[in-house]
């Protein structure tokens, strides 16, 4: 299992997808956004472009281990097992051009499922639901783009795959444009 973190101005006892996209949007796909960086989760406990909210929560969670066949990486090739499962379920081939990058594959899949020309919220949601149904649990990308092999961020498709281990009510302050935890 992987330990990850989530920051929120709201206390809750389980994750739900009905608010997916409310915090930071769906830039990295539809799902529950988690990170291996506690500092990053603390930062995102404060909604963007809003006055300081009175409450901030840091969730420590557990998610399944990543295997080559159970996740997409935004800037890496899609595992052949995922491509094959997608082709089998869709009943059509996946274009070679989209297999080179998880992000392009995800967007192509969403558009294929909805018939849209451009990927938006509905397409990202459709792709996430499809991928979850074939055993793919997440989109994954580097927490810092300059360190592709460093800490990871995750968009988990199914809330049942996220186990909350701890929820802490925290205090934060802004330092040089970042929200940090007051210890």
Regions found by a protein language model. Name each.
Residues 1-183:
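Active-site and NAD+-binding cores of ADP-ribose-processing enzymes
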